[in-house]
Amino acid sequence: MYGSARSVGKVEPSSQSPGRSPRLPRSPRLGHRRTNSTGGSSGNSVGGGSGKTLSMENIQSLNAAYATSGPMYLSDHENVGAETPKSTMTLGRSGGRLPYGVRMTAMGSSPNIASSGVASDTIAFGEHHLPPVSMASTVPHSLRQARDNTIMDLQTQLKEVLRENDLLRKDVEVKESKLSSSMNSIKTFWSPELKKERALRKDEASKITIWKEQYRVVQEENQHMQMTIQALQDELRIQRDLNQLFQQDSSSRTGEPCVAELTEENFQRLHAEHERQAKELFLLRKTLEEMELRIETQKQTLNARDESIKKLLEMLQSKGLSAKATEEDHERTRRLAEAEMHVHHLESLLEQKEKENNMLREEMHRRFENAPDSAKTKALQTVIEMKDSKISSMERGLRDLEEEIQMLKSNGALSSEEREEEMKQMEVYRSHSKFMKNKVEQLKEELSSKDAQGEELKKRAAGLQSEIGQVKQELSRKDTELLALQTKLETLTNQFSDSKQHIEVLKESLTAKEQRAAILQTEVDALRLRLEEKETMLNKKTKQIQDMAEEKGTQAGEIHDLKDMLDVKERKVNVLQKKIENLQEQLRDKEKQMSSLKERVKSLQADTTNTDTALTTLEEALADKERTIERLKEQRDRDEREKQEEIDTYKKDLKDLREKVSLLQGDLSEKEASLLDIKEHASSLASSGLKKDSRLKTLEIALEQKKEECLKMESQLKKAHEATLEARASPEMSDRIQQLEREISRYKDESSKAQTEVDRLLEILKEVENEKNDKDKKIAELESLTSRQVKDQNKKVANLKHKEQVEKKKSAQMLEEARRREDSLSDSSQQLQDSLRKKDDRIEELEEALRESVQITAEREMVLAQEESARTNAEKQVEELLMAMEKVKQELESMKAKLSSTQQSLAEKETHLTNLRAERRKHLEEVLEMKQEALLAAISEKDANIALLELSSSKKKTQEEVAALKREKDRLVQQLKQQTQNRMKLMADNYEDDHFRSSRSNQTNHKPSPDQIIQPLLELDQNRSKLKLYIGHLTALCHDRDPLILRGLTPPASYNADGEQAAWENELQQMTQEQLQNELEKVEGDNAELQEFANTILQQIADHCPDILEQVVNALEESS
């Protein structure tokens, strides 16, 4: 399948007649059957390398070369190797095989002429090993040029086929990599959703079958081309033998004078060929980098040149030319030999590359021979279907994660405010617990003093028994007071139990905080996954851009193919012009070379048959190319539809996300209102605590008064017992408070970890932004390539139009000259008739020479009949040539239509690129907005934390925390500055892109019309008004905050210059082209000044008042 044309087996003798050319296969399927049936060894089919059919120029030049080549003979005893195959045409008794241009001498006077066939591979490529005598055949320059052209055509088609094979190989490798990656995950992944996605599997399987069918069609085309090359080579060999026979016949009739004329013409032709060869060598030196695939053909052409030079030298020496001419020929041969040595050196370098190409072909052959069976293909299809289902599930998860991100944003803001409120409540509860501890200690001291007083009272009880009677009344009164105090104590114990319940509520709130922190951690993980999915989306976008670049490459290849086809058409026109010139020369030399007319008429008839076959094969090749172009267009339209569907889905997702953001903002407002209610409740709790403190103070005063009056031991013991119970309860409270403090410190650590995670995610967002900038550069490069291709196509269309006009003029001149020739022929026939009449008169006078005169008249009549037949044939050929010219014109018109369609497709691609650029801008703006919102939320959170710490107390630890929070706040402010600068830079880049696009559209035409200049002027004026509005927002913010920010800044003159828009537009309509150009430059300068002034204001705001950057962002959004 990948072999070259040299690997041909033995050729069996053909059953065709010598005068008929072998029939060419009409379709690649027929060629495929023939190669399979004969195994590449029959006379009509050859398995080998790919190539194109010979053009009409090549066929004509080959026929002319064989017609003018001189005879050369082998000795009677020289034979070619015994293993050479048989001839396709046995005209004589000799069975040996000869290289092309070499003839065998006739062994006797038999009518069967001794000529031997040569193998097609030796004729085509010259790879035969014969003695030096047999290598002396004439190969003129036209044959070498024809071979070079055919081999170059074959090489271009081989390159195309190899390129298609490489593309198919890349597709196969991509599929293999996808399958290998999915096989690892397929073992652990299985879901019932795969049943719903069988349609996707079928689509993938159909794509694979289509690729295989394309590869099979390419192989069949290669085989078809190989068969056509072999058939044309056989036909050339037959034509060469016929030309040799006609040359022998003509040489036996005309004699030596005609040979002398032919040799002189050959010498002149050789001189012209030598000049052409010098030019060709100069071009070859320039194009050495493109000789990787031509070196193999150069070997055969150089061998043919050696043989032709040796033959020509021997011919010149045998005809007795001067010594000077021989010296000149020797000098030419020496130069040619030097050039050949240089080319041989290059050949040795490029043979290695040929070996590498053969190795790659064999690998491809083995891969496609060892293709997997149906079971493996089914398994691969199932893997692909599972992979597609997994991709769909990941897309659903992506949507869910986007919703969770929006929830996280709102919950992040809420959690920061709730943390602030909780910190305040904890500080209040901590101060209240300290106050309660102090109270318990005071009560303990009072109980100890009361115990001492009780012991003193016991000692004094004996002395006071006499006074008991008097004090009983006082005791009854004191009992009532004690009962009142007991009720008060009960109320205090109830309050203490309430404080315990409040502490339990605080514990529950702390557990809720823990749960919320865990939820925050999960949301952070979800954010990380969301960022990874965003990266995958960006990778998909890059793949889409690469696919666009590949499509552009394929379009460039199609344009290159169209160029090649145009070159082929130009060659056909040149061939037709050369044919007309040859016919004119034949009409001039009719009287001198009557015998050569017979041979040339027969060669022209053979040329017509060859041209018909070549034209049919070329038409079939063109039809195949058009089918492939239509197939590629359908595939491109399919890809565009898929991309449009993806864009619509992305737009729908964005709309959903925006709706969710609006809902979340409403939730935020509701939660802020609830936070305000909670703050009011906290203030009320603080006031109730103050009231309780005042009540406690009053109770203490009452207790002091009552302690002085207490005299009984029983009441003191009861008080001591109650005090001991309270003392037991107080250390449990202190332990609980310590536990709460430890939990608060742990929650602080977790919040710091969450902050570090948020910082890491921000860094990942920066990396994503850098990748997007790189992709923007790639898109700009692709746009420049498309513009260059469009310019080249416009130039080529203009050149084609010019060439058509020149060809029309030449064809008209040729027709006029042909008519003149016909008139001159009619005059010559009248003169001949007059001479015949005179000879009839002389017959009457000269009766003695009657027999001689009768013979002369008969011969003259035969000559006249031949002239008339030749003239009719020439007229028919002129008509055929005119028809061919009309066909060429029609083909050129079709090529123009194809060029217009390619230009339209390029315009569509440009519009698609502009849409992609607009989407990229939207994505960048959204990313910058998200970053700015996150930074503003973090700054507000830091401010709240700082305020809480400043309110709590003035310990060193809190001061350090406040300093750390301030440093973090400064860092966040710097990041917010950077983000605002990035957004300003993005606006400036968008403005510069629009300006560059408008200037580029204006530069495509050398002299733009006034209407083309007015449109960019209006766009620039619109941008100028936007910049003025933005500068007005910034200056208003600066004046509200601090007018000193704008100190030293003076706005440009264009900022204060205001005019009526309608009047300015009317003035533009009345301006000349030069005035419009000056106005365009002025407006561009004004826009540049305004942009620079806006950048300076923004820098001043960032330096002096970074806390109003949020308002600057709002101004940006309003101006955009």
Swiss-Prot record:
Keyword terms: Acetylation, Cell junction, Cell projection, Coiled coil, Cytoplasm, Cytoskeleton, Golgi apparatus, Membrane, Phosphoprotein, Protein transport, Synapse, Transport
Record SUPFAM superfamilies: Eferin C-derminal domain-like
Region (Disordered) residue spans: 1-54, 801-840
Membrane topology summary: Peripheral membrane protein
Residues modified as Phosphoserine: S17, S21, S37, S55, S75, S94, S824, S1009
The keyword Coiled coil appears for this protein: yes
InterPro entries in the record: ELKS/CAST, FIP-RBD_C_sf, Rab-bd_FIP-RBD
GO biological process, one term: retrograde transport, endosome to Golgi
Principal subcellular localisation of the protein: cytoplasm
Coiled-coil segments: 144-992, 1060-1104
Tissue specificity of this protein: Widely expressed.
Residues bearing the modification N6-acetyllysine: K10
Compositionally biased region (Gly residues): 40-51
Record PTM Phosphothreonine, positions in chain: T38, T1050
Domain (FIP-RBD): residue spans on this chain: 1050-1112
Record's subcellular location: Cytoplasm, Cytoskeleton, Microtubule organizing center, Centrosome; Cytoplasm; Membrane; Golgi apparatus membrane
GO molecular function: PDZ domain binding; small GTPase binding; structural constituent of presynaptic active zone
Biased composition (Basic and acidic residues): 801-824
A single GO cellular-component term on record: cell projection
Biased composition range(s): Low complexity: 13-28
Database matches in PROSITE patterns: FIP_RBD
Source organism superkingdom: Eukaryota
Function text: Regulatory subunit of the IKK complex. Probably recruits IkappaBalpha/NFKBIA to the complex. May be involved in the organization of the cytomatrix at the nerve terminals active zone (CAZ) which regulates neurotransmitter release. May be involved in vesicle trafficking at the CAZ. May be involved in Rab-6 regulated endosomes to Golgi transport.
Subunit (UniProt): Interacts with the GTB-bound forms of RAB6A isoform 1 and isoform 2 and with RAB6B. The interaction was strongest with RAB6B, followed by RAB6A isoform 2 and weakest with RAB6A isoform 1. Part of a complex with CHUK, IKBKB and IKBKG. Interacts with CHUK, IKBKB and IKBKG. The interaction with IKBKG is independent of CHUK and IKBKB. Interacts with NFKBIA. Isoform 2 interacts through its C-terminus with the PDZ domains of RIMS1 and RIMS2. Interacts with ERC2/CAST1. Interacts with SDCCAG8.
Name of the protein in its database record: ELKS/Rab6-interacting/CAST family member 1
Gene source species: Mus musculus (Mouse)
